[in-house]
């Protein structure tokens, strides 16, 4: 049975095994990506991206205002998204029938980008949380960027390029398993190939991207650098978020590498040039994360009803890339004030080694969407 509870439970149990994981499959048939049902989102269909993303903006004094949202079917570029490990299927790899978790993650992480780009999100036979645990228990190698899941995404991307792209620029967006898959896709299919000129940027979130120590390249990619301004294109944005009060422990799942000449990369979407800045978060009003609902306390002390699916909390959160002895990460500071009328904390924690993985994307969603808009303008100007 696919339930929110089972997903949350599997996330906790899988914490000790969340590294990329190889899956043994007996040459299954490739997916038919000419079939619209093989896509969670496409710009030409009503699907998982066609959701209400209206937002209640809550100021520190408890004052409330409403913010609408709409997609832009004529957006000049495309976004191609690969979602994280969320499937509650009990098989090693998920099937191609989306469950509630796969639909929810589109709402939380990707649908909002449709205001600045045409959305493409293929369904794929990802390694499930149950599959991760089974592989670990069997002592097998752990590599999420190989096997059936990678093959599906590669096939979907190749189909997109051949039949949908038409020479347009694109942004790759991934989280967790999706980011590891996209990292390999960039290495194998994009870097050093003509299509690299069309890659406006890649958002590889909630994973570990490496660079040579003190450099912006030289690890995961040889020539594709980290993004250091919103006007820069052909670059990568990557981070894994942790609370300022709970930095990565020794057994962290993100932001570290065993290679002595490499280091984990971090780019702050709220301040690509460096330093600390307020983030533009879009949080679920019901406390939902990619693992299901969490929040029980009201957003404002008055108990005023929040009737939109999302909330924005200006000034509550700030972010800065930093390092400790274990990892490089995006440090999230919560500026709660018990004397004001607004909520003082956020949800998203699981165990210390995960950090705020469940809300990595939500924490800076507004910043990421704005970056796509600015990078698109810069890319078009240089064409």
Specify the residue positions occupied by each region the protein language model found:
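N-terminal module-boundary/linker segments of secreted carbohydrate-active enzymes
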Residues: 26-65
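N-terminal post-signal-peptidase region of extra-cytosolic proteins
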Residues: 62-66, 104-106, 185-188
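C-terminal segment of classical bacterial N-terminal signal peptides
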Residues: 16-23
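Active-site-proximal beta-strand/loop segments in catalytic clefts of secreted hydrolases
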Residues: 82-85, 123-127, 175-176, 204-208, ...
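Surface cap/lid and interfacial helix-loop subdomains adjacent to catalytic sites
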Residues: 147-166, 187-341, 378, 382
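Gly/Ala-rich beta-loop-alpha elbow adjacent to hydrolase catalytic centers
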Residues: 174, 178, 182
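Bacterial N-terminal signal peptides that target proteins for export
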Residues: 1-10
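Active-site catalytic motif of lipid deacylating hydrolases and related acyltransferases
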Residues: 37, 43-45, 72-75, 81-169, ...
């Amino acid at each position: 049975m696919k339930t929110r509870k089972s997903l949350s439970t599997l996330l906790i149990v899988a914490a000790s095994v969340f590294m990329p994981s190889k899956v043994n499959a007996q040459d299954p048939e490739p997916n038919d990506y000419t079939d619209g049902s093989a896509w969670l989102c496409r710009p030409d269909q009503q699907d998982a991206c066609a959701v209400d993303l209206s937002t209640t903006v809550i100021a520190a004094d408890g004052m409330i205002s409403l913010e609408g949202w709409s997609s832009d079917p004529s957006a000049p570029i495309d976004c191609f998204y690969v979602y994280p490990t969320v499937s509650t299927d009990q098989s090693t790899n998920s099937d191609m029938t989306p469950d509630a978790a796969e639909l929810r993650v589109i709402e939380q992480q990707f649908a909002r980008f449709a205001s600045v780009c045409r959305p493409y999100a293929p369904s794929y036979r990802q390694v499930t949380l149950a599959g991760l645990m089974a592989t670990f228990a069997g002592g097998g190698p752990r590599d999420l960027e190989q096997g059936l899941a990678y093959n599906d995404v590669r096939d979907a991307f190749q189909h997109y390029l051949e039949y949908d792209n038409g020479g347009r620029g694109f942004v790759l967006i991934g989280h967790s398993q999706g980011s590891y898959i996209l990292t390999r896709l960039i290495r194998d299919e994009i870097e050093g190939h003509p299509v690299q000129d069309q890659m406006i940027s890649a958002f590889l979130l909630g994973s570990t991207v490496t660079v040579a120590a003190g450099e912006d390249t030289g690890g995961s990619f040889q020539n594709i650098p980290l993004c250091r301004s919103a006007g820069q294109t052909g670059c990568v944005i990557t981070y894994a978020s942790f609370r300022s009060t709970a930095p990565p422990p020794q057994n962290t799942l993100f932001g570290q590498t065993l290679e002595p000449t490499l280091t984990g990369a971090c780019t702050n979407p709220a301040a690509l040039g460096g330093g600390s800045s307020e983030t533009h978060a879009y949080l679920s009003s019901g406390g939902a994360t990619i693992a299901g609902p969490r929040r029980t306390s009201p957003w404002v002390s008055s108990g005023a009803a929040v009737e939109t699916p999302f909330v924005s909390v200006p000034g509550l959160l700030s972010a800065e890339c930093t390092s400790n002895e274990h990892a490089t990460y995006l440090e999230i500071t919560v500026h709660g004030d018990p004397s004001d009328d607004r909520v003082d904390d956020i949800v998203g924690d699981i165990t210390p080694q995960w950090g705020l993985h469940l809300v990595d994307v939500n924490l800076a969603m507004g910043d990421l969407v704005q970056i796509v808009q600015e990078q698109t303008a810069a890319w078009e100007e240089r064409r």
